[in-house]
């Protein structure tokens, strides 16, 4: 056998070995191995096609013929090799076609499984997911979905197996790690559970908030597990309070006793709950269910107020729940995740019986002391009823009102509460509008301020602000409260200041509820500009800067009220925030009325105050200052008086700067144009500085705006 034939034979044998291995791998039970084999086969076929094309393109350059041409004979090895590869190619194409068909079937089975899962039919869901996996073994979502269904049936070991298969399909499958973490948590493999959750963070750092919550769940459950072990040991050792707690729960589990029997037993039990051991034993021996499922006690809660004994039972239960939930996250969780208890707690906050209302509020405060407790409140309580109940405490004593608003503040800072608030604002807006109708003379001023401040903070979000601003009753409520507070500005200083903050946010939303509303708001703010309080002055100017442009009628009233003089004083003595509002008001006034321009010139003869603002780092301030200066150029002889200043150079720099906002460039360009029109000598200077080109480039912004 010559060298070429030997080489071809070795190549053929190598191909046979490799192809045999590929066929074995394609028949593997491991979907990952199977997928790699399919990809490798496709790669080999591609290379074979390239080789064939290359062979077809070869031409013989030496055309000398010594003997007649003979038909090229292929060796048996070559024929067998090509036939084998052809069969592999055909098989690969058939497999690809079957895979596409199976993908469609697997997707359909996945949807059926999801429907069954949503209906709570977890066995059927598992069956459908399994059928889908028979069609497509490397579909990771079927493994994670089936794992979730197994979790619902508390078959955690099978769930873990499915998660492992999902990770074989995709080693960065965060869903698989999530379900693995949950399953290991249920199996009390706390360290393994933590590692699973931390792996999610490694794969996707953006899930930090969620992972933090998962890890917190692991910590809490491990802590509860240790508490139960210790409680068992103390009970077995015969500790007096532990044994008494267990015995009292057995006594209270007796059905159909008179209400006084339960009230007395619960009060004794409450006195026994002094430590974590007793709290844990209460939970371990189904204390929550013994109390909340008792028909007599349930009847007392539903009819409380008709009978003193029934009221006593309700109060005693609420005090017991406070005792068992104090600084005990697991007991808090068990109490609140039960739907009936969560609904009852929200309802009791609005009870007509003062004692019940106060004790249910005290229980809520116990829950809200920790982050996990606040999460329980947000996730499980009826937040609309809760919010309505909290604002109703404004009618209570200063201490209770402030405590309620403190709780409202804590909840409002939680991101999940904010999401809920935006989605449910139409339902809670009437309660918030009711707050604005409160008489400040009879309510706690500090608590009222807290409540309005919460509304102000929440209104910073555009969707929330849009709903609030669109509600005519809410806007009228702001006005009426402001009017009542103006009767004694010194007494209600904090309320006015906070309310103006809310109204500033509302005035960001255009158009306003009505022009009439905007006019009335402006009048109130013009009146408040006579205040001696710096904070009120600044915020009144802030509101006015947002309402003034809505109507010429308002501008006229503002001019008659001496707003130009007051705003010029702001510019000379106020801080940056006050100056920002003042220059915007002056820009609006000078844009519409010649007398406003003349008064600015009279109060700032060389326009030095205005020109100083052009060097500010605040672009809004600079833009409005340029606009105001441009308006003032329409007053005769003003432009001529500025020939010895560097105003032209400053405006030119602003108009040509790419670092400035478009509004600054446009306003500076307009001011330049008015300056050169009013005083031709400025136009000559502009030409020398090649400023016309800059002005031309600025014009494109004006035409686009």
From Swiss-Prot:
TPR repeats by residue range: 106-139, 140-173, 174-207
Major localisation: cytoplasm
GO CC field: centrosome; cytoplasm; cytosol; nuclear membrane; plasma membrane
InterPro entries according to UniProt: ARM-like (IPR011989), ARM-type_fold (IPR016024), TPR-like_helical_dom_sf (IPR011990), TPR_rpt (IPR019734), TTC12 (IPR043195)
Gene3D superfamilies according to UniProt: Leucine-rich Repeat Variant, Tetratricopeptide repeat domain
Highest taxon listed in the record's lineage: Eukaryota
Positions of post-translational Phosphothreonine modification: 71
Alphabetized Pfam families for the sequence: TPR_1, TPR_8
GO biological process: axonemal dynein complex assembly; sperm axoneme assembly
Subcellular location: Cytoplasm
Residues spanning the signal sequence: none
Matching PROSITE patterns: TPR, TPR_REGION
Tissue: Expressed in testis and in epithelial cells of trachea and bronchial tube.
PANTHER family: TETRATRICOPEPTIDE REPEAT PROTEIN 12
Disease listed for this protein: Ciliary dyskinesia, primary, 45: A form of primary ciliary dyskinesia, a disorder characterized by abnormalities of motile cilia. Respiratory infections leading to chronic inflammation and bronchiectasis are recurrent, due to defects in the respiratory cilia. CILD45 is an autosomal recessive form characterized by onset of symptoms in infancy or early childhood. Male patients have infertility due to immotile sperm.
Name of protein: Tetratricopeptide repeat protein 12
Species annotation: Homo sapiens
